[in-house]
Each structure stands twice: as structure tokens, then as C-alpha cells.
């Protein structure tokens, strides 16, 4: 327990130093909030959702009339030669006739076999699917950033453990050098202690790369301009939620998983496509109306000009007798409906399989944590006894190294088990649609 406290304090000291250099430490919740505001994938999918929202209108479905405004001018320049049955021919040159017109026209499809209504429902389905795709992207981002956040905690703790290993090896090297000077230890003992110290130092230096890589990855997910910027977080331990329940996870997965809900909307779209095809078996009814003004100016004749202002309207009823494709398209649409339902069932089975696998790994890792906690206590006590014997000269350097290695391995195993359990926990929460718990 004393060693564990030292590890935590060391990690806390690292976090405090970083905080002094790069500002206030951030919690996981704060990281997620920043990421949801700045991450490029999230911003892109939200813009795509806005497009779906804009498209889901009655006008886009064709439920509203179309109104057009027209205006025009035309002119004709003619030369005329008129020869009567009796008398002389009359020639007129440069006759210029002009026409001005302006009007408003309305076209409205009153009925087309329910196709317009089906199109509107389809646009609404696409709008809901856009919202689900946004949710899926956000859930993927929350899961990815949460996993990387705790990976950074893991790598930082591992760096602290390696630092502690270097301190132990340095102390052992110091003792060995002193004993070698007075003849208590051989040169072989001294060389072995130096080799072990260098090996631990090399591991410590290599671990810095993993910490840096994790920090860069978090900055990338947060869309920070400075990917190499310093990062300070509040957590110095990996806290695992051990209270998850299988029955609740299973029920919530079937009811709230975003991908499963999206597959259900795919099936609904296929059914709407079939309805749209069936609408072609019905007649259609179109309404047209117009209001316009026409002005004619004549270059010759008894009439100099004429203006016409009027309203016109009409109704057109039609029916497509044969187009050669309707029955074939209906058969294909029914097959598509069946396939979308099969795809949804396949996805549900795949999700339940993944949920079961992560659940088994989650429960197993919880037991591993408990077991490795006991091993850590035993390894720590074993190391303390070995150090006492080593200081008395009653324990060879190789056995001392073994005791040190056993302690470090125990710390590594429990850290790995905690992180693996956290990953399983994150996956279970995401599959069941509860990944938002990390935002609370």
C-alpha cells in the first residue's frame, strides 16, 4: 500500500507540474465538451444534419404549388405588297408590330396517387436518419476520446512506475559500488547492477515516446492547432465502474443502440419506396391557373393597339396505362424490404455478440484486478524483505533484481488490467447507447 501511495503521489506531482506550465488541469468531461465543439468529424456531421433538416419540408416534397412570373416583348418588321382584284397594288414598307406580355402562372399537383405524401414521409425519415448518424458520430468520438484519455493516464502512470524502477536500480547500483569498494561484492555484481540500471533507464526514456504520442492524439481529437502542446489532466488513476448489469445492458442495446435504430429506418425507407411505386397505379390530377396582360401595337391597319387582361384556369386528369416497369419494380422493392429487415436482424445479432464478448472480458478483468491487487501486496512485501537482506549482504544481486522485477511486473499487470477493464466498460456503454454517461 505504501508503494501504491507513492505511485499516486508521483503521478500527482507530474500532473501538478504540468498544470503550472499549461494551465488548469482538464477533467474528462471538459475534454469531451471541447471536443464536441471543435472536432472536425463532429462539425462535419452536424452540417450534414442541417442539410437533412432543411430538405424535410412540404415544398421539397412537392406538396405546394409552383408559381412563376413571366414577362416578354417581341416585334416584327415587315414589308407588305397587297394586290386587290381590281385597282392598283399597294405597297407598305417598314411595318413594325410589337407585343408586350406579362403574367403569373400557377401549377399544382392536387393528387398523384399519394406519391407526394410518400415523398414527404421519406424526407422526414431521412431527417431522422441524419440525426441518428450525428448521434453515431458523436458516440464514436466520445468513446474514442475517453479511451485515449485513460490511455494517457495509463501511459503517465507507467512512466511514473518506470521512473520508480530507475530510482530502485540507482539505489542498488550505489549500494553495490560501495560494497565493491570494500570488497564485499564482486565486479560481476557491480556490472550486473549497472546493466540493470541502464536497462531500466532505457525503458523510462522509451516510455516518454508513448506518453507524447497519446498527448498528440488527444490534441488531434480536440482539433487543437498546436498538436505538440502540453496537456494537463485531473485524473491520475483509472477508476473502473464495477456496477454494470448484463440484463440492463442487453435491454438498452435492443432498444437504444443508434446503429440498430438506423437499420430500422432503412427498412422504413424501403417500404416507402414500394408505396411510391404503387402510387403510379393511381390517376393524377393537376391544376393550372394564370393571370396575365398582353399589349399589341400594330404598325398598320385600322387598329393601332389592343390590350388584353385576363384569367385562365384548367384541370388536367391523367392516368398512366402502361410503362413496362411497375410490376418488376414492385417485386424488387419487396425483395429490398426483406433484405433491409434481414440486415437489421444480422446487425442486432452482431451487436449482441459484441456485447457478450465485452461483458465476459469486463467480468474477467474485474477478477484479474482483484487477483493482481493481492499479488501486488505480496510482491511489495517480498521486495521489502529482499531489500533488507540485500542491505545485510545476505542476498545476491540477481535475486534482488528478481524481487524488483516481480514488483514492477505486478504493478504493470494491474495497470494493464485496469485499462483493459476501462476499455470494455466504454465499449459496453457505447453499444447500449449510454456513452453519454461520460459527459455527466
Please tell me what each predicted stretch does.
Residues 6-7, 20-21, 413-440:
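Acidic, low-complexity, intrinsically disordered peripheral segments
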Residues 44, 49-51, 56-58, 120-122, ...:
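Heptad-repeat amphipathic alpha-helical coiled-coil interaction surface used
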Residues 19-72, 78, 225-268, 348, ...:
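Bacterial Sec-pathway N-terminal export signals of envelope proteins
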Residues 26, 30, 54, 140-254, ...:
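Periplasmic alpha-helical coiled-coil/stalk elements that build and connect Gram-negative outer-membrane
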Residues 43-47, 60-61, 96, 110-138, ...:
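Sec/SRP-type N-terminal targeting helices
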Residues 20-24, 70-108, 234-243, 275, ...:
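Small/polar, glycine/serine/threonine/aspartate-rich low-complexity segments that form flexible
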Residues 1-29, 439-440:
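Bacterial Sec-dependent N-terminal signal peptides
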Residues 180-184, 390-394, 431:
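A short glycine-centered flexible hinge/capping loop motif at secondary-structure junctions
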Amino acid at each position: 500500500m505504501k508503494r501504491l501511495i507513492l505511485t499516486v503521489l508521483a503521478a500527482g506531482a507530474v500532473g501538478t507540474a504540468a498544470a503550472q506550465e499549461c494551465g488548469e488541469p482538464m477533467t474528462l468531461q471538459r475534454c469531451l465538451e471541447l471536443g464536441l465543439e471543435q472536432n472536425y468529424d463532429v462539425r462535419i456531421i452536424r452540417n450534414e444534419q442541417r442539410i437533412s433538416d432543411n430538405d424535410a419540408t412540404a415544398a421539397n416534397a412537392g406538396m405546394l404549388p409552383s408559381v412563376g412570373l413571366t414577362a416578354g416583348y417581341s416585334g416584327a418588321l415587315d414589308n407588305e405588297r397587297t394586290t386587290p382584284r381590281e385597282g392598283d397594288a399597294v405597297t407598305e414598307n417598314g411595318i413594325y408590330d410589337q407585343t408586350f406580355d406579362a403574367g403569373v402562372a400557377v401549377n399544382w399537383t392536387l393528387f398523384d396517387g399519394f406519391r407526394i405524401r410518400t415523398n414527404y414521409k421519406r424526407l422526414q425519415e431521412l431527417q431522422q436518419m441524419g440525426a441518428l448518424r450525428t448521434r453515431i458520430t458523436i458516440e464514436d468520438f466520445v468513446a474514442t476520446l475517453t479511451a485515449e484519455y485513460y490511455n494517457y493516464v495509463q501511459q503517465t502512470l507507467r512512466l511514473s512506475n518506470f521512473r520508480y524502477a530507475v530510482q530502485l536500480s540507482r539505489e542498488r547500483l550505489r549500494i553495490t559500488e560501495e560494497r565493491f569498494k570494500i570488497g564485499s561484492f564482486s565486479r560481476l555484481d557491480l556490472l550486473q547492477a549497472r546493466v540493470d540500471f541502464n536497462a531500466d533507464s532505457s525503458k523510462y526514456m522509451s516510455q516518454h515516446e508513448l506518453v507524447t504520442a497519446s498527448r498528440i492524439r488527444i490534441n488531434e481529437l480536440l482539433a487543437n492547432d498546436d498538436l505538440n502542446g502540453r496537456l494537463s489532466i485531473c485524473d491520475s488513476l483509472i477508476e473502473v465502474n464495477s456496477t454494470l448489469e448484463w440484463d440492463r445492458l442487453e435491454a438498452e442495446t435492443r432498444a437504444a443502440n443508434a446503429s440498430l435504430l438506423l437499420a430500422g429506418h432503412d427498412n422504413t425507407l424501403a417500404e416507402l419506396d414500394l408505396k411510391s411505386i404503387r402510387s403510379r397505379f393511381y390517376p393524377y390530377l393537376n391544376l393550372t391557373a394564370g393571370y396575365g396582360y398582353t399589349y399589341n401595337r400594330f404598325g398598320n391597319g385600322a387598329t393601332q393597339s389592343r390590350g388584353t387582361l385576363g384569367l385562365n384556369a384548367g384541370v388536367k386528369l391523367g392516368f398512366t396505362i402502361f410503362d413496362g416497369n411497375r410490376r418488376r419494380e414492385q417485386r424488387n422493392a419487396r425483395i429490398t424490404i426483406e433484405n433491409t429487415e434481414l440486415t437489421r436482424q444480422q446487425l442486432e445479432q452482431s451487436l449482441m455478440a459484441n456485447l457478450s464478448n465485452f461483458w465476459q472480458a469486463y467480468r474477467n478483468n474485474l477478477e484479474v484486478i482483484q487477483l493482481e491487487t493481492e499479488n501486488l501486496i505480496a510482491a511489495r512485501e517480498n521486495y521489502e524483505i529482499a531489500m533488507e537482506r540485500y542491505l545485510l549482504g545476505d542476498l545476491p544481486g540477481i535475486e534482488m533484481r528478481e524481487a524488483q522485477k516481480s514488483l514492477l511486473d505486478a504493478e504493470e499487470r494491474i495497470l494493464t488490467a485496469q485499462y483493459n477493464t476501462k476499455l470494455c466498460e466504454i465499449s459496453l456503454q457505447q453499444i447500449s447507447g449510454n456513452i453519454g454517461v461520460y459527459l455527466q
